[in-house]
Amino acid sequence: LGVGHLIRWVEADVAVTAPDPHEYDLALGAYLQLPAGQLGTAVRAAAAALRPGGLLVVVGHHVDNLTAGVGGPQDAAVLFTPEEVTDHLASTDLVLERAETVRRPVPDVTRNAIDALVTARRPMGLRA
């Protein structure tokens, strides 16, 4: 009696193939460490894929992680801030819910990892 049969999982590279517009309740970009232009393309494509009420979640290694955190890519060109993600969303109709820097404990390490986290939602009743 689960809901698994109601879920359609899609694993795809939104930087290469745009998902169908207005089809998804959730778009997740987890540790999508791309150069700024490619990240913007991927974030906007994921945003366009959301139905009304749909949620976009973007989480990845923050640029500060390079000098003050631990782990993650050691290339500043693929690290980002929450503000950079929200700038990519400025041309969309998504409503920002959360945009912040998050410190994440890492086992057996004295420093935290530093992540950028953004959540935004397409308003109900909107299809563009």
Could you describe each region identified by the protein language model?
Residues 2-15:
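Conserved SAM-binding strand-loop segment of SAM-dependent methyltransferases
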Residues 15-26:
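A short acidic, Gly/Pro-enriched loop at the edge of an enzyme's catalytic core
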Residues 16, 33-34, 60-66, 104:
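Short "lid" loop at the C-terminus of a central beta-strand within the Rossmann-like core
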Residues 24-39:
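A short SAM/SAH-binding and catalytic strip from SAM-dependent methyltransferases
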Residues 40-52:
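A short glycine-rich, Lys/Arg-flanked "PGG" loop and its adjoining helix->strand segment in the class I
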Residues 53-61:
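Conserved beta-strand signature within the Rossmann-like core of class I S-adenosyl-L-methionine
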Residues 77-99:
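Short alpha-helix
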Residues 105-128:
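Core SAM-dependent methyltransferase catalytic element
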